[in-house]
Curated annotation (Swiss-Prot):
This is Cytoplasmic envelopment protein 3. Residues 28-31 are annotated as: Interaction with BGLF2. It is a lipid-anchor. It is found in: Virion tegument; Virion membrane; Host cell membrane; Host Golgi apparatus membrane. Residues 53-75 are annotated as: Disordered. Plays an important role in the cytoplasmic envelopment of tegument proteins and capsids during the assembly and egress processes. Also participates in viral entry at the fusion step probably by regulating the core fusion machinery. A lipid is attached at G2 (N-myristoyl glycine). It comes from the Viruses. Belongs to the herpesviridae cytoplasmic envelopment protein 3 family. It comes from Epstein-Barr virus (strain B95-8) (HHV-4). Coiled coil: none annotated.
Amino acid sequence: MGALWSLCRRRVNSIGDVDGGIINLYNDYEEFNLETTKLIAAEEGRACGETNEGLEYDEDSENDELLFLPNKKPN
């Protein structure tokens, strides 16, 4: 992971996180590691087809997918 952080640090000053915030790669190595782990987990969940099945139904929603793991491309 250190090599990845080093490479990214040379290329960009900051990166967006899963929650919509910004991580400064120069100052926050631990946060970068944590966010990378979250992003990898989100991608693995998307690959496995995780959904919100069993959760409270929202009539306004056209699908039951996790908001942070969209399986469909927006129109």
